[in-house]
Amino acid sequence: MFSVLKKLGWFFKAYWLRYTIAIVLLLAVNVIEMFPPKLLGNAIDDMKAGAFTAEGLLFYIGIFFVLTAAVYIMSYFWMHQLFGGANLMEKILRTKLMGHLLTMSPPFYEKNRTGDLMARGTNDLQAVSLTTGFGILTLVDSTMFMMTIFLTMGFLISWKLTFAAIIPLPVMAIAISLYGSKIHERFTEAQNAFGALNDRVLESVSGVRVIRAYVQETNDVRRFNEMTADVYQKNMKVAFIDSLFEPTVKLLVGASYLIGLGYGAFLVFRNELTLGELVSFNVYLGMMIWPMFAIGELINVMQRGNASLDRVNETLSYETDVTDPKQPADLKEPGDIVFSHVSFTYPSSTSDNLQDISFTVRKGQTVGIAGKTGSGKTTIIKQLLRQYPPGEGSITFSGVPIQQIPLDRLRGWIGYVPQDHLLFSRTVKENILYGKQDATDKEVQQAIAEAHFEKDLHMLPSGLETMVGEKGVALSGGQKQRISIARALMANPEILILDDSLSAVDAKTEAAIIKNIRENRKGKTTFILTHRLSAVEHADLILVMDGGVIAERGTHQELLANNGWYREQYERQQLFTAEEGGAGA
């Protein structure tokens, strides 16, 4: 049960002073709270003996006031230190988790659902935070407060009566221990189910347009209801165990009261105890109700926190597949890029996705990569970006193996515009500035012009300050593509990669963007992956991919002379463009 505290030992060591202050003040409050019941018993005995005076009354009132003020002040400070520490721990763990997620490679996200990761960063961290706040409170308060009360009752009143009154406690300890083991297991299942539900909601909200387009609202709601019912059932199993704690504690506390009153009255009749001492004893016994309940809550909180921390640590313990070199090469800028006999297989694939890929790109050249869907075009780029562990063969920059180049430096050279154009829920300007945070307005306008976005920009309601919505939902596909291109151009990268990034624009706009890139990126390397071959006519080298291998290679003219797939596809596209132009006329 307490293994969660051991797992969080690094935090308690780092912030030992905060928790030491909290615990010392909490213990001091516990000791101070022992005095009022004893004073009450003394006052009753004074009244019974006829020795109670006005001065005595004022004395008791004064003592009560001082003790109450001391408890109030110390309680404020221990609560501030203790619960402030819990919030701090949650902040540190959440920051650590987020930083870890940002270093993960694609295989990690292929194995883990986004909704479940969100649940680990919210619900699970809250459960762990509760452990370092309320959990520590109940641990210290329930054990030390109960021990203080126990010793006070024994030394100041009667050890005989004290031992008799705590006879039910071992039974309670056994019962609560059994409940705790069940809580850990069932709470883990409930959190896993909640993570799956969270992921389902995320998918439904982000894909609501597709759901409506295919009239699947009813089916989606049905699946959601099934998952909600599953979460409900698992939480009810947790609640069932939760509901056993309080009745168990109440039953055993009642037994303690019964023993205390019955046996205490017997001792009073035998003159082994005064009436005032019996009253004080029962007040102390009443004060033990909180720590007894707290023990039940302690088991509950600790087991929940332990289950949640295990889920968080499971994510944090996942090591990225792609790491920085231990001895990085001192390469300031990329030169020639050489792929030499590169083969690669995705972790989830059963066959090679790239086979014996070899080609050389001189610095400043433009490379076009064409081919059917799934032919391996994007896989080549993922190897260039080091998104996956390397396969066979080698990739070098200026003769330096790609594995010897620090990831930040490598990706800092590259401006990548992927197939799925992700825009952030910010303004158009903020999305473009993502490529260069300190860019001037002139640089922003230049990037917009190069991406051929000026005309569309004037049509937006607030121009550059227009909010694009979640993932750019307020924009058309072509607009999202051009903002993504402008964002990449803003960084003026040494290597620009356009991964089918012109598919949503017309041929005229595509030609204008390609023209701007050629004019403004002289001396810098560009990769263009496309299905529309007009986008790569000007390329210095064109690779035609088919089934993970290079089926054809050469310039535009050389490939036309080959009478292969490239020529057939090019002539078909030219005919289609001519027919479109004729229809438009």
UniProtKB/Swiss-Prot annotation:
Enzyme Commission code(s) on record: 7.6.2.-
**Gene encoding this chain?**
yheI
Q: Which GO terms describe its molecular function?
A: ABC-type transporter activity; ATP binding; ATP hydrolysis activity; ATPase-coupled transmembrane transporter activity
- Per UniProt, residues of the ABC transmembrane type-1 domain are 19-304
What name does the UniProt record give this protein? Probable multidrug resistance ABC transporter ATP-binding/permease protein YheI
Membrane topology type: Multi-pass membrane protein
* Main localisation: membrane
- What is stated as this protein's family in its record? Belongs to the ABC transporter superfamily.
Additional observations: Overexpression reduces the sporulation efficiency possibly by modulating the function of KinA.
Which of the seven top EC classes does this enzyme belong to? translocase
> Is the keyword Oxidoreductase assigned to this protein?
no
Alphabetized, the UniProt keywords read: Antibiotic resistance, ATP-binding, Cell membrane, Membrane, Nucleotide-binding, Translocase, Transmembrane, Transmembrane helix, Transport
